[in-house]
Amino acid sequence: MPHFTVVPVDGPRRGDYDNLEGLSWVDYGERAEREDSDGQGNHRENSPFLCPLDASRGNDYYDRNLALFEEELDIRPKVSSLLGKLVSYTNLTQGAKEHEEAESGEGGRRRAAKAPSMGTLMGVYLPCLQNIFGVILFLRLTWMVGTAGVLQALLIVLICCCCTLLTAISMSAIATNGVVPAGGSYFMISRSLGPEFGGAVGLCFYLGTTFAAAMYILGAIEILLTYIAPPAAIFYPSGTHDMSSATLNNMRVYGTIFLTLMTLVVFVGVKYVNKFASLFLACVIISILSIYAGGIKSIFDPPVFPVCMLGNRTLSRDQFDICAKTVVVDNETVATRLWTFFCHSPNLTADSCDPYFLLNNVTEIPGIPGAAAGVLQENLWSAYLEKGEVVEKHGLPSTDTLGLKESLSLYVVADIATSFTVLVGIFFPSVTGIMAGSNRSGDLRDAQKSIPVGTILAIVTTSLVYFSSVILFGACIEGVVLRDKYGDGVSRNLVVGTLAWPSPWVIVVGSFFSTCGAGLQSLTGAPRLLQAIAKDNIIPFLRVFGHGKANGEPTWALLLTALIAELGILIASLDMVAPILSMFFLMCYLFVNLACAVQTLLRTPNWRPRFKYYHWTLSFLGMSLCLALMFVSSWYYALVAMLIAGMIYKYIEYQGAEKEWGDGIRGLSLSAARYALLRLEEGPPHTKNWRPQLLVLLKLDEDLHVKYPRLLTFASQLKAGKGLTIVGSVIQGSFLESYGEAQAAEQTIKNMMDIEKVKGFCQVVVASKVREGLAHLIQSCGLGGMRHNSVVLGWPYGWRQSEDPRAWKTFIDTVRCTTAAHLALLVPKNIAFYPSNHERYLDGHIDVWWIVHDGGMLMLLPFLLRQHKVWKKCRMRIFTVAQMDDNSIQMKKDLAIFLYHLRLEAEVEVVEMHNSDISAYTYERTLMMEQRSQMLRQMRLTKTERDREAQLVKDRHSALRLESLYSDEEEESVAGADKIQMTWTRDKYMAEPWDPSHAPDNFRELVHIKPDQSNVRRMHTAVKLNEVIVTRSHDARLVLLNMPGPPKNSEGDENYMEFLEVLTEGLERVLLVRGGGREVITIYS
């Protein structure tokens, strides 16, 4: 047998290689041409991340440090060349991108996208404030406090604010579960709940936003005609303040005019709306500050707004000036206008007077007593009224009697019947608007950070304003004034304006402009929402509304929005439109909470929100609260809203495809399973729904016992009881003779699955060859859409010592089968050292060595493992390799950004691997590998001799490797910078005694073998990577590593096994991962 000696040599200068016999320097700069398909199933798949990088591929292929992966670099590119693309994403939704490309017909020419730059304050917090504060605060909150009382008003505010806060928490979880492109709330809901629910809820949200525009316009008209310019009314009501047909017609005419003007403004350009947005917000803030200033001033100097009372009834002050029955003029008692109204005569005769007017005195009380007057105690309790009932003050003396019907218009009366539920429906729109920030997601610098912080902060701020306003109004304003919706008792002043400082006009003007601004914002946002739904193409008849002007403005959608808003204008009553608005928003919020609860309970791998302060119980509580509020405020409106959503759902489902509901004969379970399987079979899952569905291939011993049960343990830890797990095995033989054996093996595996707590199915096949049986399992396991997408395959231990080449041939053929089937492959090496389900790692790392990108499996697997109690405490580290021409600092930044978008917590490290010369150790090890392979083919050795020879080579490999990698400091100090080099000594070989009868004639030619250049490069990759990995990850709990693909030429299979051995040498637990050729993890929500 030939001998090898290990001798120290000088450092690796290029000239030293020339002294080695049979070694010539190879120039690796030139690359060979590549084919689109390798004939072994390694087909390309179109993907934004798995794409041929023709521009830079030339240098990549023959990079010495990555030569082991060179055959597949066109479909599995280098990480360094990919990170820039991964972190630079577009703000357009997928549907919008497809729509734009279809319209332009050329995807090549694109306008340079402007980078999003808005932060939390300007992008989320202030827009949410502007949308939440609205017309209800200024026009209805005082009336609500007077009607419901301070305590019940606080309860209404608490319920509504809790509803929006819980929804905001759920929305924050969804918004931080990936990058939220433009499309905001609709995008989040539709991508979380699917097209049917997403389309239904998206349209509900759109209708809610459209009716909000109508509500704001009606509020602006009410302010204009009631408080700013009452003479501008075209129609005059028969009574003083009743909502007669004349008043409603005024609202309709002016509302239509306002709507037309606002639509024209939005059509001309949304930039004008955005320019005035800050002005409108300033109006809101100034108005609120003036209310607080007036409340403080009322403590020591309350404003003078007297209220005229007849008995305990409140009189409407807009038709008379003097609050008295008679006055003395020139020592003569004369009747006032008030007497004239009640007695229908200027004379002081009581013949035709109203009986109640004669029996009760006229008094005047302060409308704003101030915070120090103690009216809060009187205003604590509710005073609900029926329609037409007079507003009365409790505690004032009054003689009850029937009055004249025509005198009713002189009192302040309730225009609608009130109750707790009615007030809830009217008030709820004043807490909507929480999605204004998420609707601007495309403009946010960091949506995952800004949306939760800005939205929740805005809700807390507005809630505090509402709570304090309720208490302030109850403490400062007289109860009868609070219940006076239109301010008739205080000379037709806006009630909240009477408290404001320095003037009521601050509130009147401020509220008018803020409601106009909110209406413009709604008319701007609603068409864009409809355009996003139309571009998704889930509702065919809406497709036309996806088109717009050349600059993308949704012209047709704006027209439809204006028409629907006109329906709200025709209703003409703010109190009637508000509950409709509440229904649609509550429906939307209900499904946001449902989406969060469902995602949390299903525990899909893609559900990794950065926002951690959520729980499915909070989402369920928010969903229940939304449903309860819908039926509490208006049960018939709730039914109509749910009917509309249901019809949209069924329409989208019908348009998508015909659905199979099952025959129902064999029971509900079978019907549901069949229906679900038929649904699943429609196509592959979306990237965000991808989870590993495992096919675990087990090896059985002669007694049909599982040889490596830790494979099942690993599968149970990876799955954590979720998803599909199929355990398969092959029995070699004839099916007719081995059927009973297969049944016994299946039962043995099922028992082991129960022990290891693997929830799944078992399948044992009988085949004449193990390779064929494994191929059959890979092809045929599963049913319909419930099929495996990942294969767990054990490592063939002892393949070097085996006399039968099938030991490693079966393994490599199975690798090729999984690649051809586009399945992911997981190969746990040293499986005996993997932890059991009863062990706990209290610390340590799971190290990911991301060499090439093949779909993101390497990032997803540690996340799934860490969901299990065994690996829960382990921290994740990601290493990637940088070459000489890579910017390692930028790579580290890009990788950190990419992981941030993936919502994965991991330490990031970029390892620089210089293009060092190929070491003599690498060269000699390659030579030994090829010589050993040649010798085993050529020599007719007995089994004993073959085992001894193979073990001898292995022992020399291990000893040399340990000496090279793990030499202690003492030896290093002696050797200095010397390297270890293996040298083939021909003299020793010639002097070696050996029996020529056991050797072929051409054995002597083995010493003249030159190692294949590609094998030298591959061995160099394996050695260098192994050195780096062992140095940094020798103490890791688990190392995940890209698995190189098998060679295209099957003659190099044995060398491929050797490369994998060298790559993983010295590591305790290794998981070799090979992606299936598709993306399995995404930064998007």
From Swiss-Prot:
Glycosylated residues (UniProt): 312, 331, 347
Extracellular side: 142-149, 226-248, 298-419, 474-504
Residues bearing the modification Phosphoserine: 24, 47, 81, 88, 734, 916, 967, 1050
Residues binding ATP: 697, 699, 707-708, 730, 794-795, 797
GO terms classed as biological process: chloride ion homeostasis; potassium ion homeostasis; potassium ion transmembrane transport
Binding, K(+): 131-132, 216, 429, 432
Protein name (database record): Solute carrier family 12 member 4
Species of origin: Mus musculus (Mouse)
Gene that encodes the chain: Slc12a4
